[in-house]
């Protein structure tokens, strides 16, 4: 079928889920539905369950779930509080639900991370028989100054890896049959200024890729088969052009911050993106060729994105081929579709959605 649908959320209220339609023959993108959701629960990161029958959202002070009947029929079913530190749910704290990872194997629990202050616990939620968020079954500790922004499972879904931006380390946990997790260990990031924000893993489970927000680089790790902890290979790749001015001369603050990384369906390529902290600068998108074992063979490109990316610039490869990659930004509210062909990346379609806080990450429905 030439028609594909993606869902996208917002950084700020009012809460809404936007469904866009991509025609891979006509090469067009259009908004087909704006689904209103609870006003104060905008979704800054969303993910589907293993069957794409439920959509889960990181929604300010809540974790939310929706039944997905079709691309345009999305029904709110649950809003659950952040677990762990009781101050996380206070209206007076800046703690925010930032990321969640639904398991693809039974019991299909959802693993969720708050961010900013009072974010020292990961939350595990069970789901109902239909997949709606049900109970907060575990709040497992990291450390008091933790701020996890991304997680990934190994291919067997036995080990869970977390990128701790504020504590500057990577964590490994073992998943138990109940869906709960237990600590394996942690490793510090290679540099004090790295701040790991995102992790992705090769389908072999041999290699882990850690995106460093402040370091603006992608670091390659091998997973130790005995301990299952990530071991840095001392191979890293730039996510902003080497030599570019990366500090504001007046304030000394960083001008760029790396965002997310994701593999293509085949596992042969990895995309990663970075955002700029000023609207008059551009963000960047990088592509990497991976060897069969999972090690990075070559960085293929480092292209500027149309805007800074704002809070977003999230790169989202489709899940049925290596051909299509969506990129969203919340500086101007664009959804853009890129074609990955012969190891070149080019834009084929875009649509602007001028809504508050649009657009966060895009997820592929079909």
Task: Describe every region a protein language model picked out.
Residues 8-12, 57-60, 112-117, 162-165, ...:
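Conserved beta-strand positions in repeat-built beta-propeller and related beta-rich domains
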Residues 19-28, 65-74, 124-133, 173-180, ...:
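Short loop/turn segments immediately following beta-strands, especially the blade-tip
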Residues 30-107, 300-302, 306-309:
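Blade-loop segments of beta-propeller domains
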Residues 47, 101, 152, 200, ...:
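Conserved beta-strand position repeated across blades of beta-propeller domains
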Residues 73-154:
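Asp-box/WD-like beta-propeller blade repeats and closely related beta-sheet repeat scaffolds
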Residues 80-91, 138-143, 188, 233-253, ...:
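Surface-exposed loop and turn segments in beta-propeller and other repeat-based domains
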